[in-house]
Amino acid sequence: MTTSIIERIDAWAEKTPDFPCYEYAGTRLSYKELKRQSDAFGSFLLKNLITDKEKPIIVYGHMSPLMLVAFLGSIKSGRAYVPVDVSMPVERIEQIKKAADPSMFICTEELPNNLTITGCPVLTQDQLMDALEKHFGEVPDKEACVNNDDNYYIIYTSGSTGNPKGVQISQNNLVSFSNWILQDFSLSQGLRFLNQAPFSFDLSVMDLYPSLLSGGTLVPLDKTITANMKDLYREIPAQNLDVWVSTPSFADLCLLDENFNQENNPRLTRFLFCGEVLAKKTASELLDRFPDAVIYNTYGPTEATVAVTQVKVTREIIDAYPSLPLGVIKPDMRLHIVDQETGEVLPEGEKGEIVLIGASVSKGYLNEPEKTDQVFFDYKGYQAYRTGDSGIIKDGYLFFQGRLDFQIKLHGYRIELEDIENNLKKVSYIQNCAIIPKMKDEKVDMLVAQVIPTTHDFEKEYQLSAAIKKELKEFMPAYMIPRKWIYKTDFPLTMNGKIDRKSLNSEVNK
């Protein structure tokens, strides 16, 4: 088997040229078309970009086949891609563009009117289509392609300073992850994969590349569908899905529909979950409704290429433990539980920080050497990452014990609570604030903002909340905006003068 991701995907253009690699709402892209178009785009980039190949290419859009073409074309030109979804606020896009310092900004959809990209070439959607037409039939030099330890993609995650961090994932990282998924999860040729997560969220890698590498079909549910529950419930059975990849929260939403079951989705026999805690209640109900299905619970940070552990969730597993295990580490990785202060490796049964070592671990954050050195390190010749997650090993399984800092997972999105607080403090009506996660069924249900407001003229608190949210929407993604607002005149403080978060947490999670 060749190790190049591109060679393996392109091979399907010969084996099954007319089979769809992407299909949704009447839009269909075959493997032959994917190869021809990505070849054309790779040729265009090689002829028109003279900048350093270390500089990535930003691809802006939303779950369209053109994004796949742009991703693979970028790789064929020797450059990593940075996916940026249309749902991101303008300020966030500007932050990513500044941090990534890209060689080109590619638009598969129109940019917002209030966003102007400067400092690098911008390729509009029309220009992209024109490039595909003009370079049709050209094949880029294979030697130019991303390979080995070259960056393959860079995904930006929430950062504690309010600025996103770019996680560099190499070709080798992605090969390691993809081979593990295809083998351990028994994913055969020609399956239809649900694509629920936007490409800017690393959960999408769990469906995108296993699908393309196995000659399968990617079936996206874009934001217009997922925003309307009636449309969502109608579309899912119509797509004849084989493999379900999502956050547990998305599955919970679908379980509200009594028709979400095996009878209406006869081909759906694999569920892969990542991004947040899978509750026992969710897993149990899925097993009831889908008796032919296998459910996998997985765990991993963006810094270790999506996921590094897995467990097949059975009735026996559900009954045996108070919470579901995250599973066992993939074969080419090691997992240590360490004392956060001393770094000493702890024995099974003791709680500590999860440290990941091996083939899936990123080289670090793009253009951020200091932040990289804080959490990445060399362990006996292997790349290692301090996750900041607390865990414990029992019966050989990893169990999640929460975050060691203020970072949480909400509906699959990794969020730094400090990031939200720093952004809230930009709002004119907020003097000080603290963000508290409200827990339900072993996971974060929503974010609660405790706020000391500035002087204002609003008569009702809901009017103040509306004004705050209006300002926030200008520079913060919707998923980071708190759902509940509590207003205070002051905060309880600890002995050293810091906000007493334990006290605030006990108020929210009574």
Swiss-Prot record:
CDD domains: DltA
Catalytic activity: holo-[D-alanyl-carrier protein] + D-alanine + ATP = D-alanyl-[D-alanyl-carrier protein] + AMP + diphosphate
Record keyword Nucleotide-binding present: yes
Localization in the cell: Cytoplasm
Top EC group: ligase
Involved pathway(s): Cell wall biogenesis; lipoteichoic acid biosynthesis
Positions bound to D-alanine: 202, 306, 498
Main location per the UniProt record: cytoplasm
This protein's name: D-alanine--D-alanyl carrier protein ligase
Source organism (scientific name): Listeria monocytogenes serovar 1/2a (strain ATCC BAA-679 / EGD-e)
Lineage of origin: Bacteria, Bacillati, Bacillota, Bacilli, Bacillales
